[in-house]
Structure formats: structure tokens, C-alpha cells
A protein has these predicted regions:
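Major-groove recognition helix of helix-turn-helix-like DNA-binding domains
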Residues: 44-59
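Histidine-centered nuclease catalytic patch
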Residues: 157-188, 199-211
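Short, Lys/Arg-enriched anionic-surface-contact patches
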Residues: 2-22, 134
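Short alpha-helical "recognition helix" segments of helix-turn-helix
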Residues: 34-39
């Protein structure tokens, strides 16, 4: 059962990490509306969710190398979920979307595959579908939110912070690296013009991310 206040289940941890990827470090607190919503869905307190997200932060090289730190007491199951996500971002992004949809509709997660049908089937970005809720859209939205949160909603080259003009750009093109298509560390938050320049090879990055 996903909804439980006992020991953390793997499904709860997946949903927590899924949310962690989409929030900047400064918003990992119990007053965050998104944390409150997840807490309500899975039967946890907002404080418990916030603490778990900060536990995940202790495993995040991007956080640790910046001089910040999490709580440092991540469990073995926390680490297992972390590794699973990094091994298959697409699969876990879809699975978490299914879990969230199931909880939000009041169904058990096991029934979601039938409720949604093929709309969230694991498929390539090349697969075309006319359904409103598609795997492609789920993946794209996850990657965009994860990348923008990593860069605190600002273009990493110009500092522009207007969301409507920001693009989550892939460092290694998605067509060339299927494994890391949804990996936030393979993304740059760029303004539309910088994204276009980067895509056309007018701007390049060195291995240490110098322009």
C-alpha cells in the first residue's frame, strides 16, 4: 500500500525522489505546496517529506560539491532508489507518473496501467500518439522541470529568468544518448536564443563547462 505512515515504502521513496528532482534545494521545506500535496497523497507529514528530500540531497553530487549538504542519514533503500533512477530515468519517470495519477484519482497504483491504457506506455520519443496524456509529454515535462530547478529557473549563460523564454536543452543530444535523455545532469537551462545558438554549434562548452 502506497498510503502509509509506517516505514517508508519503495513506491513512496520513488515519488519523493521524483519530486526532489523537480525542486531547487532552497524549496525543500515543509511549507512548499508541492511537498504538502505529496504528503497528503501518501499519508506522510510535510515535515517527513521535506526531511526525506534533504536526505536525497546528501546523495547528490551537485549539492555536495557546491558546499551544501543534506541530512546525511540516507537509508539503504534511499540509495537503492537513487541508483535505480540513474540507471533508467525514462522508466522511473513514467512509473512515478503512473503512481501519482493513481493516487490523485483515488485508485491503487496497480490499477493505473489499465486506467490509463497505452497513454503512459514506455515508448521511444519517436513514437507518435494523439492521446492527451502521453509518455512523451510526461518525459518532457519531467526533464524540463528537473533542469530548470537545477539552475534555479535561470538561463545558465545570460541569467534570464522568464520561464516562457527558458528551454531545457540537452548537452548530449537525446538522439545520441538514450540512457541519459531524462538525466537532469545532461541538461542546461538556456534562453531560447542561447539554446538555438548551442544547437547550431555557435556556442560550445568545454568539459569543465566553460563557454
Amino acid at each position: 500500500d502506497i498510503v502509509t505512515s509506517g516505514r517508508w515504502t519503495k513506491e513512496q521513496l520513488k515519488l519523493a525522489f521524483h519530486l526532489y528532482c523537480q525542486l531547487p534545494f532552497g524549496r525543500l521545506h515543509s511549507r512548499n505546496p508541492e511537498i504538502i500535496k505529496l504528503a497528503t497523497l501518501i499519508g506522510r507529514t510535510p515535515s517527513a517529506i521535506a526531511m526525506k528530500l534533504v536526505n536525497f540531497a546528501s546523495l547528490d553530487p551537485a549539492i555536495v560539491t557546491s558546499g551544501r549538504s543534506g541530512l546525511g542519514n540516507a537509508s539503504s533503500l534511499d540509495k537503492e532508489v537513487w541508483k535505480e533512477f540513474h540507471a533508467d530515468w525514462e522508466k522511473l519517470a513514467i512509473e512515478c507518473a503512473q503512481l501519482r495519477q493513481g493516487l490523485e484519482r483515488g485508485y491503487e497504483s496497480e490499477t493505473m496501467a489499465d486506467a490509463i491504457g497505452d497513454d503512459l506506455a514506455l515508448e521511444d520519443f519517436t513514437g507518435e500518439t494523439k492521446q492527451v496524456l502521453t509518455a512523451q509529454r510526461v518525459k518532457q515535462q519531467f526533464f524540463r522541470r528537473a533542469v530548470l530547478s537545477s539552475y534555479r529557473g535561470r538561463c545558465c549563460m545570460s541569467g534570464l529568468s522568464e520561464p516562457r523564454l527558458l528551454i531545457a536543452s540537452h548537452i548530449v543530444p537525446w538522439s545520441k544518448d538514450k540512457t541519459n535523455r531524462l538525466n537532469p545532469s545532461n541538461g542546461l537551462c538556456l534562453s531560447a536564443i542561447h539554446d538555438r545558438a548551442f544547437d547550431q554549434g555557435l556556442i560550445a562548452l568545454t568539459d569543465d563547462f566553460r563557454i
